[in-house]
């Protein structure tokens, strides 16, 4: 998984559950949710990004 990769969301409580987004950034410092994912549609707060852990994503490649 790298910047620009397409990923599918597995976190059930997420607004974007089962949606496909693009990896915008990855943090290597050891934080809990290091992968920032950008989506086409916005959520109810008018936000189109969210952070996820590696095990909450399926890498679909570029």
Curated annotation (Swiss-Prot):
Annotated localization: Plastid, Chloroplast thylakoid membrane
InterPro entries xrefs: Elect_transpt_acc-like_dom_sf, PSI_PsaE
Main localisation: plastid
Membrane topology: Peripheral membrane protein
One Gene Ontology term, aspect cellular component: photosystem I reaction center
The protein, known as: Photosystem I reaction center subunit IV
Taxonomy of the source species: Eukaryota, Rhodophyta, Bangiophyceae, Bangiales, Bangiaceae
Reported function: Stabilizes the interaction between PsaC and the PSI core, assists the docking of the ferredoxin to PSI and interacts with ferredoxin-NADP oxidoreductase.
Keywords, sorted A to Z: Chloroplast, Membrane, Photosynthesis, Photosystem I, Plastid, Thylakoid
NCBIfam families with a match to the protein in the record: PRK02749.1
Recorded family membership: Belongs to the PsaE family.
Organism field: Porphyra purpurea (Red seaweed)
Gene: psaE
Regions annotated as coiled coil: none
Entry-linked HAMAP family: PSI_PsaE
Domain of life: Eukaryota
One BP annotation, GO: photosynthesis
